[in-house]
Amino acid sequence: MKSINKKQLTNCIKIFLVSVFFFSCNSEKLVEKKIDNVKYVDPQIGGVAPFLQPTRTRIHLPNSMVRMYPERDDYRDDQITSFPLTTRKHRSDLLFNIMPVSGDLPENEAPISAWDQELEIAHPYYFSTWLEDYDITVEFTPAAQAGLFRFNYQNDETRNLYLRNLSGDNWFLNSDGSLTGSEIFEGMKAYVYAKIDSLNIISKGIIKRDTINSWISWGNNKPKKIQ
């Protein structure tokens, strides 16, 4: 068998290293081509319409059931009244509206808060905004058939979660800490099932109702985050 001298071995190693480097460069290019085009979608485009209805800041993954946007007239509106768990049309008719609130509100008064356009983040896969009146940061992430809200309370006021009264079966707090309810519209019925944090937190909350609102209040228990 013919032996390989030192010079030939060195050349082989160089060729191998060049091949590995070339493969690594090509691999990086392949990874770059797999970037999801959703990252280029800006939900804020079309938020102001001079003549027709504006588009909404919709947080919605392609081909998914959950569509959320903050309830306000359009992008110029400086106040938010609630966040729906989903919508039944592309720009209206919200379902299962909720709103985090810090501190106490008078009975029969729906919450409303100013927001800061410069602090809002909106992508099809993630949303975040700051409620100035309540000092709460709201985060939302959609999935195909569900969504996750996270409410970050920044002050030491009482933690409340406003639940807009439903057109069907009202909100019900189950013994396992889950929330259920239904909405009726155009001869159809939508259902909601929600879990809030963990049982040891939600079991300390109660649902209070007035003529237009339902509330979950944590009283003296003040978790920094509720989701």
Where are the language model's segments positioned?
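A generic "functional-site adjacency" signal
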Residues: 4-5, 19, 145
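Sec-dependent signal peptide recognition
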Residues: 9-18
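Accessory carbohydrate-recognition regions in carbohydrate-active enzymes
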Residues: 30-227
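N-terminal secretory signal peptides that target proteins for export/translocation
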Residues: 1-10
